[in-house]
Design a protein with these regions (language model features):
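Acidic, low-complexity intrinsically disordered regions
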Residues: 1-212
Length: 212
């Protein structure tokens, strides 16, 4: 059976408190979307890894579990605070999942942040970029979603990430961002089921939301 691994890396730093409610709702909607995809495409096993991070922790809420084994997250699961060790979160997340997958597996990595790297200790930009470039040669697709106060295109380019989207850091913008991401996730899986690879740089094409 074909497997699709959904790695979702979400910033839990203090500044995310502005959109805490919408972020939590959006994460739950994403989990439900993956479950719906599993139902629509039973020939592809959907697995979920959900990682949140700030300067005090890198936490796996889900660690490579079946989509149907996920549950609705509560406010206890997402409590913004601290700084933004973005490189550590990405490096730790993709390195762990890489050890759990085979080269033929399909992996969709979604990175959501409202801030730039400022306190990583284990990984630097070069290390993360090299990891991403290596995994892109397999069936890994990387997406970066950031608030529009950031240079999202520049951040994505520095990490060798082809697909990126910016969104306003407010309730409406956050809600629409998750909607756009979920539509794109469904499209990605439909193309996989049909044996058509998603072209790099086209993940968010024609989806609601602001594409850089």
């Amino acid at each position: 059976m074909k497997k699709v691994f959904n790695l979702i890396i979400v910033d839990e730093s203090g500044s995310m408190s502005i959109i805490e409610k919408q972020a939590l709702m959006g994460l739950n909607e994403t989990l439900e979307t993956v479950k719906k995809i599993q139902k629509a495409h039973p020939e592809m096993e959907q697995r979920v890894t959900l990682l949140t991070f700030d300067s005090t922790h890198t936490r796996f809420i889900y660690d490579n579990v079946r989509a149907n084994d996920t549950h609705t997250l509560s406010r206890r699961d997402y409590c913004p605070g601290g700084a933004t060790p973005l490189y550590d979160a990405i490096g730790i997340g993709i390195s762990k999942l890489n050890a759990q997958t085979e080269p033929a597996d399909n992996v969709l990595v979604t990175i959501i942040t409202d801030g730039e790297e400022n306190c990583s200790e284990e990984y630097n930009l070069k290390m993360v970029k090299n990891l991403i470039e290596k995994l892109k040669k397999q069936n890994w697709t990387f997406t970066l979603i950031g608030t529009d106060n950031l240079d999202v295109e520049g951040m994505a380019g520095s990490l060798s990430i082809d697909d990126h989207m910016a969104f306003p850091e407010d309730a409406k913008g956050t809600t629409e961002m998750f909607m756009a991401g979920n539509v794109a996730r469904c499209c990605y899986n439909t193309m996989l089921a049909e044996g058509r690879p998603m072209p790099r740089g086209h993940f968010f094409k024609n989806k609601k939301g602001k594409k850089e």
